[in-house]
């Protein structure tokens, strides 16, 4: 009897799918977040896979992640983006997180079209990005996200 129960449990464990990355999209962020990345990516002219890579890095796809004053999928700080939120009509930082983060990225791309500079500025601020850029260095954060974005693009046939 114990052997039969153990066999059933083993089979159940083996046959139960493990949820990691979506087989279709190769990312573990929610379908809703992926749809937002596509929608806002198209609206702002930013690669959706870049937005997905940022979300994976910043919050591991957890919509209600918090780290100090940074919140949500893209770890946006209400303190630093209050005016942006008002302009965009965002009243809940968790609900409008991808929109606010994408709008900020678009602003950074308008200032400097170098992907690594933009990612360093997003993560550490413009002054930090300028110092790193002038020293001809890229942060591990920027390189990691750029690589993951490129990987997602390849997986999506781009």
Q: Predicted segment positions?
A:
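Non-catalytic cell-wall polysaccharide-engagement segments
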Residues: 2-36, 40-44, 61-62, 79-158
């Amino acid at each position: 009897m114990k052997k039969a129960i153990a066999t059933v449990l083993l089979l159940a464990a083996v046959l139960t799918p493990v949820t990691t990355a979506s087989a279709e999209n190769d990312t573990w962020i929610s379908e809703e977040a992926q749809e937002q990345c596509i929608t806002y990516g198209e609206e702002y002219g930013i690669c959706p896979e870049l937005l997905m890579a940022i979300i994976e890095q910043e919050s591991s796809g957890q919509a209600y992640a918090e780290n100090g004053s940074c919140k949500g999928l893209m770890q946006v700080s209400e303190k630093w983006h209050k005016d942006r939120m008002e302009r965009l009509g965002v009243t809940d930082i968790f609900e409008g997180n991808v929109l606010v983060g994408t709008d900020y990225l678009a602003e950074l791309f308008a200032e400097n079209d170098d992907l690594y500079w933009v990612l360093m500025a997003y993560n550490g601020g413009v002054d930090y990005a300028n110092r790193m850029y002038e020293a001809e260095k890229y942060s591990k954060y920027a390189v990691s996200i750029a690589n993951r974005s490129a990987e997602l693009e390849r997986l999506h046939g781009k």
